[in-house]
Regions:
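N-terminal secretory signal peptides that target proteins for export/translocation
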Residues: 1-4
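Bacterial N-terminal signal peptides
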Residues: 6-20
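Catalytic-site microenvironment of enzymes
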Residues: 25-213
Length: 213
């Protein structure tokens, strides 16, 4: 896994060099690396250009130290908040679920924020169930509005209501266009990068998400 992650990091870095954040079409591309915080090997991601945003899982062994290291690199950091999935998969610490009251959701987000104190935004880890539900997403957006944070919808379901609720409550938001590494093979990742570039050239901006491996 360690050797593969190094290869993935080098691939991502080389592709970023070939794919400027402002292309000749003035298209903006944002790249987010999810799932950071559980493994010491995640530190290898810090060799990526500082324009790459890290989304750190809260309450993990390295959430605070990696958050601080990212700040030293002037790298943007997000909280990768576990949210309930339709599959019922185990979510991990700091998870938001459909049976939580609004105050409990806000308290959970506040506690998670302490472990990633310089987060400027959150995105959902899983969340195919929760992002469809009005009440928990309203509580989430109310917290973000209060703290001046924004939301990136990982779009784990096409039925997500997160963006519409964020818009209603005045929370700046974006959504994921392309998952780069759902098939973690270099050829597939390169193909997905090309897809990301096409989306950016067509719409003027695109958000890609990749993961540590």
């Amino acid at each position: 896994a360690f050797v593969f992650f190094q290869s993935l990091t080098l691939l991502l870095a080389s592709l970023l060099i070939l794919l400027p954040f402002k292309s000749v079409y003035a298209a903006d591309i944002a790249l987010i690396i999810d799932d950071i915080g559980y493994k010491s090997d995640d530190i290898n991601a810090f060799t990526l250009p500082s324009e790459v945003t890290f989304s750190i899982l809260p309450h993990t062994p390295y959430s605070l130290s990696f958050s601080q290291l990212a700040e030293q690199q002037q790298r943007e950091v997000m909280m990768h908040v576990p949210m309930e999935a339709l599959s019922g998969k185990t979510l991990g610490p700091g998870a938001l679920t459909s049976n939580m009251l609004p105050n409990a959701i806000k308290a959970s987000l506040a506690a998670a924020h302490k472990s990633v104190p310089n987060a400027i935004a959150i995105n959902n880890h899983m969340g195919s169930k929760l992002t469809q539900l009005t009440l928990p997403m309203t509580a989430t957006m109310e917290y973000l509005h209060e703290k001046g944070l924004y939301f990136v919808d990982s779009r784990t379901t096409r039925y997500s209501r997160a963006e519409s609720i964020a818009d209603k409550l005045g929370v700046p938001n974006l959504h994921r266009h392309v998952f780069l590494d759902h098939i973690p093979e270099p050829k597939h990742i390169a193909m997905q990068f090309k897809r990301l570039r096409r989306v950016a050239n067509k719409y003027g901006q695109a958000v890609g998400i990749a993961h540590t491996h």
